[in-house]
Amino acid sequence: MSTDTERVEEGTETSFLESWRDWYHLPVLGVVMLFMFWVRAQSYGRFVTDDGTPAFAGIDSWYHWRTINWTAENYPHTMPYEVWTGFPTGRYVGQFGTLYDQLIVTAAMIVGLGDPSQQTLYTVSLLAVPVMAALVAVPVFYAGRRLGGTLGGLVSALVIALTTGQFLSRSTVGQLDHNAVEPLFMAIAVVAMMVAVTAGEREKPIYELVADRDWSALRTPAIYSVLAGVALTLYIWVWPSGVLLVGIFGVFFAVQLTLDYVRGISPDHIAFVGAVSLGATAVLTTLLIEQPGSTGSTSLGLLQPLLALLVAAGCLFMAWLARQWNNRGLARLYYPAAIGGLIATALLVMWLALPGLFDSTVGNAIRRMVPIGGTATDLTIVEAQPPESFFNSVFREFGSAFYTMLAGLGFLLLRPLFGRKFRAEHTLVIVWTLFLISMAATQVRFMYYLVLAVAIVNAAFAAELVRLFDLDLESGLTSIRSLETYQVIAVVLV
């Protein structure tokens, strides 16, 4: 009897340990999120006035507050028009009256049981930004987990929780600007695209399957690709200038399809993901158009669906060109040069035939993403100015985590040299990170975007440290006892 009891207890203990190993990250992630919210809600009392008069930090917060009030009275409609800007005629302002304001009002509607009071609306608005900042830990964790396992994901969540700088200062109570919700939805869009391209690599969709309408073989990559397109659309809906992520994805697909073809892999797999995801984005952003004749990046107009459609078409064209290249027996090494020449030609034609669209795409890309050629208007806006010293700025923002991120990028790039698989999502993270670094060097406000890459890529760095020191974390203390002194010193220094 005692033996049977011991076996049952041993089995129960083993089952508990296995469950804890599989799910321990959830309570840890929950604690991290609570900590992020708690830190940002410390100054709540400063914004609770005796007479109930709203008090916000920053100027743009008041624009959102007026939009939120109007939306609450006319729910679910929003007002992308600012009557006090250019008074008395007012003007369209695409960055206000977005999904962000609608989400806050929806939360207030739930709390206020369909009829929120002014006080309820104000309280929800005060707490919305800290909540959204805390939620950033979720997509950051899952992105980090894809690069460095569960431990890497938790490292990513801890990095973003402990990071000070602009991401913290722009997401505290009293701030009502869209600066906190932008990183949240960008992180969701990037994670969704990571999942989609991995599904494309795994399921290997090709043109023949589409021609034969073999939906059973195409279902999984198609679903994940559409979801990635939806996530990208939500990001643009929150911030119309988020169309820059469409451009980043476009560069990624151009690089990845070229790499695949040169390595002897069919570009159809990733081209399918690009065409479906960006095609879905083109359709959905068309439904969001508020200024049909506008190609500006700050309004929901033609730019977003047109650029998404161009990227989708570009993916299809590159896959078609690869097949033609094979049919003619041309050397694969010349394919990248052909793609580069065609892109340059397309930009030249756009500059000559569609100068307005060229300026909206290339001009805005240079203005926001390349640390040269800033406009005089940008230089008069504090947050749009380039940092005086980039490396001093990133050290103030992220400490040594920025440099461990660079090491993580190096580890990702060197994976093939060590016989380890280099996946498409690795290319995506590398391209995206390089763009975020360039953006942060262009406008100081984009430091609150760079924090995403710093946190996520540190997961790869942490995973490589574990691999380097051969730490088997699941086997207990055995491997830790085998550590040499120099290895412990190295970890402490890092």
Regions found by a protein language model. Give the residues of each.
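Start-transfer (signal-anchor) and selected internal transmembrane alpha helices
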Residues: 1-50, 59, 135, 140, ...
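Membrane-embedded helix bundles of polyisoprenyl
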Residues: 34-36, 128-146, 150-216, 220-258, ...
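Juxtamembrane membrane-water interface segments that cap and precede transmembrane helices
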Residues: 112-117, 288-300, 362-398
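Perimembrane helix-loop-helix junctions
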Residues: 206-215, 219, 245-333, 464, ...
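Membrane-interface helix-loop-helix junctions at transmembrane boundaries of multi-pass membrane enzymes
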Residues: 218, 264-269, 329-339, 357-361, ...
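Hydrophobic, aromatic-rich transmembrane alpha-helices
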Residues: 253-254, 316-325, 341-352, 399-420
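Hydrophobic/aromatic-rich transmembrane helices and adjacent perimembrane loops
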Residues: 427-430, 435-478
